[in-house]
């Protein structure tokens, strides 16, 4: 079994305004994989990439690199390099100078280092590990204590009915509710706004008649909110301490490696010489096909050429993970396809782990070993490109990944479905019970256009559009429109037959959470 290189464990990112950009994102990535985060704009994929790179801090969760949490590790020390959508090149530097820039801090082993120095480096690491383990053990003890306090606080909220009912109430909601009560009480009958009277009564400690229902409601609300405010402050203080432990656990987890690296930088490794920098830069320039433009400035290059420079600049520092933030989205179709092919080739030849962010389904399916489909900050489905396309786990994924035709029906028996009065075979033999309601999906390209009465159904051609390699055909069957892609031309108004293979009949669960959103 291949070892996990990167485990993004239960990552959540909530901004100050309460917006959850990423919610409980959990993904394991193996060394050398090409992984794509795919989803519509605003789904959280770019935020997730920034979290991996270190440009954003997660609210919760861990970034485990070879089992060590690096979420608090400085960007320069992470095993990643990022290729941005806008290239981010230095305009005052040539292509070669841009690529050489990252090599200024790159190091390599010194020649003829005595074996005893390596043994000392191991001692430094072991000593630091011992110290780190003690610190982490102490932090875990503190975590257990704080978690117990948080549970006690939760019980306090629950035990007091009045407090529990207003637990999520914010201050402006509280003031608004009080104002409404004062309005009911008639305290503003002198023409002054009830909201102002609230402040007046608050500071004058007005006496309330607890026999009056509204006065009693005001009294209970004030009392509950005051107690809640005290609990909130205590709760926030405890949770802050609890969350702060994440930082220190992450710090001590990386501490041994950092101490060893400091020792090695001083005693074992050295910076590259000018000659070595030149040689490495030329190697990568040749690799990405920029030899003829190495002395040009970014402003003299096309978008495709500039993106090659950005990619070369990331490759030259030899990271373990390349992060690609929609690097091809601004390019025209021909250049984009060319660079897609080159990315695929580079990945195969170099064996580096690639993590790509894109909203382009075709790009994700053609480049990736693994596709991660995202929506609303969460993972909808993870799998091989063929699995995502042919076996989506929800209507939302089915509709997002390419064109599709969806029928409502039933899984009537093992390997057999029924929809719109049609009984059809399917290669789906697990995961469904007999007569279970479900959705049946058939992709447009999986229909075979045959003569009328020679297929499984007959349909009337409503429209035909030539797309180059295929004809985009819209057919009417009963009350629904079916999309078909065929190689043979048909004419509007033709009556045709449609057929399909068992393997092309895909079955989707009907109770999946996002199905309602997809209909």
From Swiss-Prot:
Residue ranges of the region described as Insert: 107-270
Molecular function, one GO term: ABC-type polyamine transporter activity
Keyword Cell membrane set for record: yes
EC code: 7.6.2.11
PROSITE patterns: ABC_TRANSPORTER_1 (PS00211), ABC_TRANSPORTER_2 (PS50893), POTA (PS51305)
The ABC transporter domain, residue ranges: 6-401
Binding residues for ATP: 39-46
Its membrane topology: Peripheral membrane protein
Extent of the signal sequence: none
Assembly mode: The complex is composed of two ATP-binding proteins (PotA), two transmembrane proteins (PotB and PotC) and a solute-binding protein (PotD).
Job of this protein: Part of the ABC transporter complex PotABCD involved in spermidine/putrescine import. Responsible for energy coupling to the transport system.
UniProt record similarity statement: Belongs to the ABC transporter superfamily. Spermidine/putrescine importer (TC 3.A.1.11.1) family.
Name of protein: Spermidine/putrescine import ATP-binding protein PotA
Gene that encodes it: potA
